[in-house]
Amino acid sequence: MSLVGGFPHHPVMHHDGYSFAAAAAASRCHEEPPYFHGWLISHPEMSPPDYTMAPSYSPEYSTGAPGLDHSHYGGVPGAGAVGMGPRTVKRRPTANRKERRRTQSINSAFAELRECIPNVPADTKLSKIKTLRLATSYIAYLMDILDKDEQNGETEAFKAEFKKTDAKEERRKKEMNDVLKSSGSSNDKKTKGRTGWPQHVWALELKQ
């Protein structure tokens, strides 16, 4: 009991209170944020002034929220996209295959047509338009010979009805008719089998 106030006096435990405060402070010092501690370990090359510029720890980056990009924190880009399967590539329709078949069919038809034209030089490469022109000229030549045979050797040549085109085409047809007339008058014998085509006709056609 205290002699001053007459009340019982409880001694103050200064030593124990100081120990409790020191323990609490020590525990707070040891409880460092795990992100800051890991950041210090992973960035040893940074100087102390740069520590204040480091990004603060935010819980939203550790919750794995969707739509967040973690690539600037060392994460794998695109890791947040879940359920994304391989992209399916749609195949194009079979139009390309049909086009290749059509082209092959046309080329085969032109190759067969070139074989039907006689006296073609071996080193001569004919285009499609040249093949068609030579084929029509050869057909006109054969029809002219057949027509002259029916007319008992008359020299009048067969004239096919063509639409009028430009002056160059008309001149070519006129020259062809003149060549056919001259070749028919010089050769009176009736040929047997496949009829040949005179070489000067080839020379005239290749000049075009």
From Swiss-Prot:
An example of a GO molecular function for this protein is: protein dimerization activity
| Superkingdom in the source lineage | Eukaryota
Start and end of every bHLH domain? 90-142
Q: Which PROSITE patterns match?
A: BHLH
Which cysteine pairs make disulfide bonds?
none
Q: Give positions of region: Disordered.
A: 79-106, 161-197
Q: Which cellular compartments is it found in?
A: Nucleus
Q: Name one Pfam family in it.
A: HLH
Q: Which GO terms describe its biological process?
A: cardiac muscle cell differentiation; cardioblast differentiation; cardiocyte differentiation; cardiogenic plate morphogenesis; determination of intestine left/right asymmetry; embryonic heart tube formation; embryonic pectoral fin morphogenesis; embryonic viscerocranium morphogenesis
**Which GO cellular component does the record give, naming just one?**
nucleus
Start-end of Basic residues biased regions: 88-103
**Keywords on record:** Developmental protein, DNA-binding, Nucleus, Transcription, Transcription regulation
Q: Where is the composition biased (Basic and acidic residues)?
A: 161-178
InterPro entries listed in its UniProt record: bHLH_dom, E-box_TF_Regulators, HLH_DNA-bd_sf
Its subunit composition reads: Efficient DNA binding requires dimerization with another bHLH protein.
As for what it does, the entry says: Essential for myocardial and pectoral fin differentiation, patterning and morphogenesis.
PANTHER family per the record?
BASIC HELIX-LOOP-HELIX TRANSCRIPTION FACTOR, TWIST, HEART- AND NEURAL CREST DERIVATIVES-EXPRESSED PROTEIN 2
The protein here is known as: Heart- and neural crest derivatives-expressed protein 2
Q: What is the lineage of its organism?
A: Eukaryota, Metazoa, Chordata, Craniata, Vertebrata
